Amino acid sequence: MKKKYISLLLSVLLVGGFTSCSDWLDVEQNIEKDADEMFDTYDGFKGALTGCYSDLAKTDLYGTRMTMSNVDALASLWYMEGSIDYRDNIQENYYLRVHDYSQTMSQDVFQTIYSNLYNAVLETNMIIKAFHEGKGVSIADAASRAVVEGEAYGLRAFLHLDILRLFGQVPVNATLQVSLPYSEITSYDENLTYYTFDEYVAKLKADIEQAKTLLKDNDPVALYTYAELNELGDEVLVDDDFMTFRQYRMNYWAVRALEARMYMYLGDKTRAHDIAMEVINATTTDGDPVVTLSSNLDYGQATNRRYMSPSECLFSLYYDDLYEISYPLLCGVPTSVTTLSSVNRQNNLTLSTSWKTDLFLGCDPNDIRSRFMWSDTRDSQSNVYPTISKYYVSENSTSGVIPLLRLSEMYLIAIEGASTLDEVNTLYSTYMASKEVSRTDYFKSMNEVITELSKEYRREFFAEGQMFYYYKRNNTRNLWSNESMAMDEGLYIIPNPDRDF
């Protein structure tokens, strides 16, 4: 049989002697590896799996386009004007903001995202195929073997859900049907098979179920908290170093959070609520919470502020050079660092002062997001244009996190799917307490809840690429900041590009 070759970004994991999280992810080399030999060793599986995570962190996927820029531009979140001569990577966001899909720049964005998503899926398929062929026996420990396979299924599901949310039809009461490939191919020579919405969702659910089964009794998160698994050196509590830093991997609770996200997107709010509550209440065998909501401990430290809420991440990507991608795009230097930061609207994504005011309209002034998340940066004419500090790290920092699934989302899903106002108010009070807001006014109707939820998604997940999907699943007609342009069902369906890869 003809051997298939694939170029993988293979990260060589130091099985012993980790000195930092960057050691875990950053010792990497581009090599072309014979796929028939790669999975003959545990190190081969490690490299292939870590290569998947490395690909997700690229700027063409979650490093920028799927989080900070393009997908949030589709939600019309960034303040942009047609009269400004933007740099190309900002201009493309203007076209997305006004939903002009006919522009070459827009089409290039869609092709880039689409191809990179399916390329990342193909790499997960290579790992899954290796297990189907019995190569998993090269991983001696049965639990580690199950975790690696479970992560591959979880990643494949994660990617396919985002393909569906971006390029698929609206999930509820669709009048326009879209078929999409659910990729299980392991070579670029193979043709992708297209599926109807229902067929696609069935495969997505099957992958999530498989990931859950493999991870449930084998993932170290059953025994330890995320914080304990992030300990380094002699403090590591597991024998296999590859099983540490579970917040940066598709762990069991990340898969459950993904499942809750999926069911909420599909309109099954009750099931989404129930799963989200399981994640919220998750504990180790010792009864310790696996993860808790981020608080002032993340946002308000005098040093090493971490605005991207890493402590509450259920799944995130580690990005060693986050400053190099976030600062040129977002600026976002906190006033606590310098009051002289300058923004250039041709180069940076910003808000206007009125938009920022509206974003936090009616919010308690103690809300740590309004206090720490945004910086009132000025342009060369001293005009203020707020920039987001979520991804700010110092230029010399070696730490950076891109959140992909957070506990805050589980709270908002649980609130939206709750059956009583009492439960809604209890959950929302806990959620807001983590933002240093003590509530005195409570929701009196479910309509009030829905109105507030759209505002909360916007405040909480700005620059994380989630707002467009919230609008899409609700088929929202008028987007915040872009009410002059009415959305319709067709505008929520991103045109499928001409090429798969």
Where are the language model's segments positioned?
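Hydrophobic-face positions in mid-chain alpha helices that act as interaction patches
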Residues: 70, 243-252, 264-402, 464-465, ...
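Membrane-proximal, proline-rich intrinsically disordered regions
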Residues: 21-78, 276, 319, 465, ...
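Conserved, well-structured interaction surfaces
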Residues: 46, 89-167, 190, 194-198, ...
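Long, intrinsically disordered, low-complexity segments
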Residues: 203, 397, 401-402, 444-501
